């Protein structure tokens, strides 16, 4: 590795994991599913335990076939990785390199600029609009002959705002066919906006679209690490070529298969989280907090210069959210009692 390359790596910010301290701490910082794994998923993992002396199948054929059947696509269109973040990294390495550019909204998923630089490409962040949505016109204007990939995050992390089908279709009309548009839909299960885009509906007419999803959020498999992309067979094949071997464990593959078979139970839990999201939003709005309506399993509090003080108050009450100094606080939706503690902590912060 050259000295210049080492300097780039050493200059990368470390990804900041959501904080949690102490036995009685309430961790609302990582957008995790607060419910324990479904019994059928635990059973599937348990059955797999005696076999983890063997490597997982690199082809991941069974889980890819199950995903394909669930979403009505061909298995050749599905690629998997150890979480959607790894699949995003695969996309960048497969499609971009030195001298290339990757466009994404900002603020958005904080791994985007890190992964872009690791791939050797140049990050092109495009600021959100004043209402914290993607500025699609500005993103289209940012396209150059060096653009290789564009990320759209819907619902957006950390603001919870969504893109609508009509505006995405208009945006795609401005994107060259050789530029890949990644629809990062990690939080799509929590969306209740009928106008919101579903990336899967775009694939037939837009072969440069890739849909990125995960089992970490709604499915509750964050600790097992499995995500997937659905795209053209050609792009999926490229992803498998650059993937690190054996990263998607046998346990993760079987848990994902079992999760897709438990859709009714999954939806019941998601509906409970969405109901709590509405309750917490209403309570905090009554307290006077400035919150954008969210279609994810978290809320964004625009706290600006007061962010660090509010965070200190929350931590003093044992409540840990994800904070960005001078910008805002992302509060994950947890169990009812956990949300009650967050509401109480924030009521004390607003008094301060």
From Swiss-Prot:
UniProt entry tagged with the keyword Secreted: no
Enzyme class, UniProt record, top EC level: transferase
GO MF entries: aromatic-amino-acid transaminase activity; histidinol-phosphate transaminase activity; pyridoxal phosphate binding
Residues with N6-(pyridoxal phosphate)lysine modification: 217
EC number of this enzyme: 2.6.1.57
Alphabetic keyword roster: Aminotransferase, Pyridoxal phosphate, Transferase
Keyword Transferase: yes
Reactions accelerated catalytically: an aromatic L-alpha-amino acid + 2-oxoglutarate = an aromatic oxo-acid + L-glutamate
Signal peptide location: none
SUPFAM superfamilies: PLP-dependent transferases
Domain of life assignment: Bacteria
A GO biological-process term: L-histidine biosynthetic process
The protein's required cofactors: pyridoxal 5'-phosphate
Purpose of the protein: Aminotransferase that catalyzes the conversion of aromatic amino acids and 2-oxoglutarate into corresponding aromatic oxo acids and L-glutamate.
Subunit record text: Homodimer.
Family statement drawn from the similarity comment of this UniProt entry: Belongs to the class-II pyridoxal-phosphate-dependent aminotransferase family.
PANTHER family in the record: HISTIDINOL-PHOSPHATE AMINOTRANSFERASE (PTHR43643:SF3), HISTIDINOL-PHOSPHATE AMINOTRANSFERASE 2 (PTHR43643)
Protein name listed in UniProt: Aromatic amino acid aminotransferase
Species of origin: Cutibacterium acnes (strain DSM 16379 / KPA171202) (Propionibacterium acnes)
Gene: pat
């Amino acid at each position: 590795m050259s000295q210049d390359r080492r300097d780039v790596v050493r200059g990368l910010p470390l990804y900041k994991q959501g904080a949690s301290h102490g036995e009685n701490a309430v961790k609302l910082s990582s957008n995790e599913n607060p419910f324990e794994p479904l019994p059928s998923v635990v059973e599937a993992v348990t059955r797999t335990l005696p076999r983890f002396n063997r490597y997982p199948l690199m082809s991941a054929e069974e889980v890819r076939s199950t995903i394909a059947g669930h979403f009505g696509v061909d298995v050749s269109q599905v690629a998997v990785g150890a979480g959607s973040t790894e699949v995003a990294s695969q996309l960048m390495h497969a499609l971009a390199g030195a001298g290339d550019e990757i466009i994404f909204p900002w603020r958005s998923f904080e791994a985007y600029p890190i992964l872009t630089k690791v791939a050797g490409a140049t990050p092109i962040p495009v600021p959100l609009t004043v209402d914290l949505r993607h500025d699609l016109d500005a993103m289209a204007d940012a396209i150059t002959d060096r653009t290789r990939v564009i990320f759209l995050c819907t619902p957006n992390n950390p603001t919870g705002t969504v893109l609508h089908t009509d505006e995405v279709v208009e945006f795609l009309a401005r994107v060259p066919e050789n530029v890949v548009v990644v629809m990062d839909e990690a939080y799509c299960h929590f969306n209740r906006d009928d106008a919101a885009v579903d990336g899967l509906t775009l694939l037939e007419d837009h072969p440069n679209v890739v849909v990125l999803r995960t089992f970490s959020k709604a499915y509750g498999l964050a600790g097992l690490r499995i995500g997937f992309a659905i795209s053209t067979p050609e792009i999926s094949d490229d992803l498998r070529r650059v993937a690190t071997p054996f990263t998607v464990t046998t346990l993760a593959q079987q848990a994902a298969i079992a999760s897709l078979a438990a859709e009714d139970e999954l939806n019941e839990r998601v509906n409970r989280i969405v109901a709590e999201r509405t309750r917490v939003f209403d309570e905090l709005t009554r307290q006077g907090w400035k919150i954008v309506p969210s279609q994810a399993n978290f809320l964004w509090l625009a706290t600006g210069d007061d962010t660090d003080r509010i965070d200190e108050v929350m931590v003093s009450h044992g409540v840990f959210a994800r904070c960005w100094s001078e910008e805002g606080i992302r509060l994950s939706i947890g169990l009812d009692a956990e949300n009650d503690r967050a509401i109480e902590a924030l009521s004390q912060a607003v008094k301060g």
